[in-house]
Design a protein with these regions (language model features):
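Polytopic transmembrane helical bundles with strong interfacial aromatic enrichment
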Residues: 1-158
Length: 158
């Protein structure tokens, strides 16, 4: 797909019924964004607790596997809330997102973060909870999710 075809797709998204409806409302965007931020807090909290445990910074008496399993449900709920609110927010300003470097950084790191969490971090941690690689996995995960959150926040300023 060429860049001009991609921008046409983004115009299509922005011109959708949902995009127009959100843009035409005074309160809808901030209400949706409020729930988006709640999702960020839930997902972010689960990331901080899980990754800080992997790095050995908190909950040192709790087994790593137990902490990861306990935070997984909250992670999934936060992610669901973020996606279900992020899509309509995106539709309301898709063209702006197309030209936003922060948006593309967020999307790339989001895909990497999800893949890393479910295909690398969690399986490795649950198989080998005492390895020397565990703190590095926690740090890498925390760094990825921090980039996702920071770049997402920066979209509002770009």
């Amino acid at each position: 797909m060429e860049p001009n075809q991609i921008i046409e797709l983004f115009y299509f998204f922005e011109d959708s019924f949902i995009g127009q409806y959100i843009r035409g409302s005074t309160w809808l965007f901030p209400v949706i964004e409020s729930f988006h931020l709640i999702g960020l807090a839930v997902l972010g909290g689960s990331v901080v607790i899980g990754d800080f445990r992997l790095m050995g910074l908190i909950l040192k008496r709790e087994k790593i596997g137990y902490v990861i399993k306990q935070t997984r449900t909250w992670f999934k709920f936060g992610f669901f809330l973020l996606v279900s609110t992020g899509v309509p927010l995106f539709l309301s300003e898709a063209v702006k997102c197309f030209y936003s470097r922060a948006f593309w950084i967020k999307m790339i790191c989001l895909v990497i973060g999800i893949a890393f969490t479910f295909l690398v971090r969690n399986p490795l941690v649950l198989k080998n909870q005492d390895g020397k690689l565990i703190p590095l996995l926690g740090f890498s995960s925390f760094l990825l999710w921090t980039i996702v959150a920071a770049s997402g926040r920066w979209i509002g300023f770009s």
